[in-house]
From Swiss-Prot:
Residues annotated as domain SMP-LBD: 45-238
Top-level taxon: Eukaryota
Any Pfam family hit: C2
Keywords assigned by UniProt, alphabetized: Membrane, Phosphoprotein, Transmembrane, Transmembrane helix
Annotated stretches, region: Disordered: 551-611
CDD domains, per database record: SMP_C2CD2 (cd21682)
Biased composition (Basic and acidic residues): 573-588
Entry GO terms, CC: membrane
Modified residues (Phosphothreonine): 440
Coiled coil region boundaries: none
Name this protein carries in UniProt: C2 domain-containing protein 2
Matches recorded under InterPro entries: C2_dom, C2_domain_sf, C2CD2/C2CD2L, SMP_C2CD2L
Major location (coarse): membrane
Length: 696
């Protein structure tokens, strides 16, 4: 029994030992597996997330182009300061490498240090691929031409960057320093050394490596980063580099259709003399779009041609080319002296200021060069339009000519001149006008109507009075005088036009003899027969009209709106106040109305004429007789007897055929004045309250 218990006890102890060994082995196996297996990822803490955000922000700041330009320039300044401070027999001068280089900076290990409640420092380590410098090395006593230029490369490079931020400051000070690591390689290589100097330069390069390491480690450059809040436009302007070496930021493109291009002071310098003397040259400036053309004044043939005129062009988005043509006497391509083509850049507003261009013989690029053209260009924006000096007031004149050829061969010409009030001419030149805005001449408008043929009866008729649309009293002689009737018709038509602010209106009526004889002019002969037939038809009506001149109304020559019952004309016994008005008016009208436009260009012989007084200003209507101020007067001269062999006028022929008693005395101005003087002594003789002329 005792032996059996001892065996059981031994087996139990052995089992416990084996179990202990198994447990130890299991733990060892789990430990080995845990070592071999990668550690599980832990959930990111909030601090790590903030750190990643700060790394991204700093990386974005350090990759900006403006930052790269500033920190390289600051580093070059710090290296030159340290080199000058160190001194020694070898003088070093660092420069920024103008060649483009990519600065890819990676931010690592960002840490934050709080120095005080108002200042905070953020420290980070930055790694870059390659950094390039230019260094000029030479003896201290050597001149600039004896120094050798070297290229310095650092790859890779490690920097320690510190951001110093203060609460009351809007700028962040950034400092950095070079961190030396074993893998950083410094390479110094001379630029194109000579064969004799190659050995000495290589030895100097090895000495420069140690010196450069010391200077890089000692330099501590710094810049300021602005954190001031700005508007979008200011932020766009800050993106432009401030360095003068960089190309300036192009301005905002202007609105081309609002710009104006001014070209002035054009001067042409020719290599050779133009040739024949006595010729004049002209400059033609032409823009492609919108098409505008300006022509300068003529300049005598000299070696240096110049025009001081100013041309203003309207521009749009398609304005690309301006052509200056120099030609002789404004001729076409045959007299072309040279062409200068100017390309316009409205985005940069070029050309601007005085510019010089080649003057070539043709439009081809390989044309012969004849000289140069210099002109001054300027761009005017809407708010900068130059205010032209106010020119003196000018008056506008309107001259209207109306010619009528009657069947009898008489030419009746009516010339009416109207001068308006002086006005201020703004001088606004159209794009196709070549005159300077300040040199706008007095406006003269000439209207000349075509010559027409009128078949008018030549019998006497009563005289009546009517008013035109321009408040001008017209004396209507219905049939009594064909010349006066044609003139009244012409004046009635012209008086329909309402003029603005008339100052002076003068009318002259001229009737002349046709230079072509009736025997040579077949058309005039036919019209003569037609007029003779009308004379025989209307003879009865004219005879009755002679006995009753006061009862005839206005004829059909009066405008349609004037066909109202006309007033009976007191032609022979005017009132006393009418004569006084005539005496005040008779001196100035004829003498004041003068000018080359009143001369008859045809040069016809004058056999009979009518004259009217001038109307000064806008006159008011007055109730009165014929000879009042502002009234139009038409009167005839006494018909002159001529030899039938010396006259070709049908009126003269008819006059010679008629007896002396049949000639009707016209109501001339002399008769009117004589009758007026007689009435002062004899009194006024009236019939039914209206003076009338007895039948002749």
């Amino acid at each position: 029994m005792g032996s059996w218990l001892s065996e059981v006890q031994w087996l139990f102890l052995v089992s416990l030992f084996v179990a202990a060994l198994g447990t130890v082995g299991l733990y060892l196996a789990q430990w080995a597996l845990a070592k071999a297996r990668p550690p599980p990822r832990r959930r990111a803490e909030p601090d790590e997330l903030r750190r990643r955000e700060s790394d991204t922000l700093l990386s974005w700041i350090l990759t900006r182009d403006s930052w790269g330009n500033q920190w390289q320039a600051a580093w070059v300044t710090a290296l030159n300061y340290e080199a000058e401070k160190r001194g020694g027999p070898l003088r070093l001068s660092f420069q920024k490498d103008p060649r483009p280089q990519s600065l890819q900076l990676t931010v690592e290990k960002v840490s934050s240090v709080v120095k005080s409640t108002q200042e905070k420092v953020v420290i980070c380590h930055v790694v870059g691929e390659t950094l390039q410098f230019l260094v000029s090395a030479g003896p201290a006593s050597a001149t600039g031409s004896e120094c050798q230029l070297y290229d310095v490369h650092l790859s890779p490079f490690h920097l320690k960057v510190e951001f110093h931020m203060e609460e009351k400051r809007e700028d962040i000070q950034i400092r950095w320093s070079f961190t030396h690591v074993p893998e950083t390689a410094i390479k110094i290589q001379p630029q194109a050394p000579g064969e004799k100097q190659a050995l000495g330069v290589n030895m100097l390069s090895e000495a420069l490596e140690d010196l450069f390491k010391h200077l890089v480690n000692a330099a501590s450059p710094s810049v300021f980063l602005s954190t001031k809040p700005t508007q979008v436009k200011e932020a766009q302007s800050l993106q432009c580099p401030s360095s003068t070496a960089q190309e300036p930021c192009p301005p905002k493109p202007p609105r081309a259709h609002e710009l104006k291009l001014q070209v002035k002071n054009i001067r042409v310098s020719l290599i050779n003399h133009p040739g024949a003397s006595g010729l004049s040259h002209v400059c033609v400036a032409q823009l492609n779009d919108p098409e505008q053309r300006f022509i300068s004044t003529l300049v005598r043939n000299t070696t240096d041609l110049s025009w001081e005129e100013e041309f203003t062009f309207e521009l749009n988005a398609k304005s690309k080319e301006l052509v200056l043509q120099i030609s002789q006497d404004g001729c076409s391509s045959e007299g072309l002296l040279g062409i200068a083509t100017i390309h316009l850049d409205l985005f940069r507003k070029q050309p601007n200021g005085p510019q010089t261009f080649r003057l070539i013989s043709g439009t081809e690029p390989d044309s012969l060069v004849l000289g140069s053209v210099t002109a001054e260009f300027s761009y005017v924006e809407p708010g900068e339009l130059k205010s032209w000096p106010a020119p003196p007031p000018v008056s506008a004149a309107k001259i209207e000519k109306d010619r009528t050829v009657m069947p009898c061969g008489t030419v009746v010409t009516t010339v009416t001149a109207v001068k308006t009030k002086p006005r201020f001419d703004t001088g606004r030149a159209t794009p196709l006008n070549s005159e300077s805005p300040v040199r706008t001449p007095v406006t003269v408008k000439v209207i000349e109507k075509d010559i027409s043929v009128q078949a008018i009866s030549c019998h006497s008729a009563p005289v009546s009075k009517t008013f035109s649309s321009s408040d001008t009293e017209l004396l209507v002689l219905n049939g009594s005088d064909p010349v006066a009737e044609v003139a009244i018709r012409q004046l009635s038509e012209s008086s329909k036009l309402k003029l603005k602010s008339p100052r002076k209106k003068s009318t002259i009526i001229i009737s002349g003899i046709s230079k072509t004889s009736l025997s040579q002019d077949h058309n005039a002969a036919l019209m003569l027969d037609y007029a003779a037939s009308m004379d025989s038809t209307n003879q009865g009506d004219a005879t009755s009209a002679l006995c009753h001149p006061e009862a005839t109304e206005a004829s059909a020559t009066t405008p349609p709106e004037e066909n109202e019952p006309a007033q009976t004309l007191p032609a022979l016994k005017p009132r006393e106040n009418d004569l006084d008005s005539w005496e005040l008016e008779k001196e100035s009208p004829v003498a004041s109305w003068s000018g080359p436009a009143l001369q008859e260009p045809d040069g016809d012989e004058l056999s009979e004429s009518s004259l009217s007084t001038s109307e000064l200003g806008a006159m008011k209507k007055h109730k009165g007789g014929l000879l009042r101020k502002g009234a139009k007067l038409f009167f005839r001269r006494r018909h002159q007897q001529k030899d039938p062999g010396l006259s070709q006028s049908h009126n003269d022929l008819v006059f010679l055929q008629q007896p002396e008693g049949r000639q009707k005395k016209g109501a001339t101005l002399g008769r009117l004045l004589n009758r007026k003087l007689l009435t002062r002594h004899r009194g006024k003789h009236t019939m039914n309250g209206v003076p009338r002329e007895p039948c002749i």
